[in-house]
Regions:
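Active-site-proximal cofactor/substrate-binding loop regions of enzyme domains
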Residues: 6, 15-17
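A conserved pocket-lining segment of Rossmann-fold NAD(P)-dependent short-chain dehydrogenase/reductase
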Residues: 18-30, 41-65, 69, 73-92, ...
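Short helix/strand-capping connector loops at secondary-structure junctions
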Residues: 161-173
């Protein structure tokens, strides 16, 4: 299911009233090394003899999550959800230029412009979402804006959570945890390619 489709499914489930089946969603962006993501793209460019690396925008940022962390989030959601939550992990951000420097430090970077529909930064919790968001420690959970099965307090008590501050939002450009060039190299070797080398 798409993100929008998943959220509509949850909303419909909540509106239709109590039943045995429960739905929740996980939201975590791109997985490190997944098909079409920037890490294998840069590695392939470098290894095929590119003389430069294309960067859509020098200020672009993204959240960073490994496949293992994504699976852990899914398992957490399965084991802990009341139903209707959207679970979001607390994960570091990276700058696209730092990924390029981690993979091919000697290649120049050329800005080519953002593609249609592409975002400069990744936003996983908007200010509007935050009005229904609680902090679970390692994760956030956006609660249903309309919930017939459980009250807001039920979710807070079930997850032993606290409400996020007013005006909170969770975006890759304002994150407080950041990957460095060196940490990206370590994670590429650990999660993407054990034979990764700097060239």
């Amino acid at each position: 299911l798409s993100l929008v489709g998943s959220e509509m499914c949850i909303r419909d489930s909540n509106i239709s009233g109590p039943r045995d089946i429960k739905f929740s969603v996980v939201r975590y962006g791109n997985v490190m090394g997944s098909r079409g993501s920037v890490i294998p793209f840069f590695i392939n460019k470098r290894d095929s003899g590119a003389v430069e690396l294309p960067i859509t925008n020098m200020k672009m940022t993204r959240f960073n999550i490994s496949l293992e962390a994504g699976v852990a989030l899914v398992m957490f959601a399965i084991g802990h959800h009341l139903g209707g939550e959207i679970f979001i992990p607390k994960i570091p951000s990276y700058r696209i230029v730092d990924v390029a420097k981690a993979i091919a430090p000697n290649l120049p970077l050329v800005e080519v412009g953002i593609r249609p529909g592409e975002k400069l930064h990744e936003e996983m919790i908007t200010v509007t979402d935050a009005m229904n968001t609680i902090d679970l420690g390692p994760y956030y959970a956006i609660l249903p804006s309309v919930a017939f099965n459980h009250k807001y307090e039920d979710y807070v008590n079930h997850h032993n959570a606290v409400k996020v501050p007013e005006g909170f939002h969770y975006s890759s450009d304002t994150n407080t945890e950041w990957e460095t060039v060196e940490s990206m190299r370590e994670k590429i070797k650990k999660y993407v390619d054990p034979n990764f080398e700097i060239k």
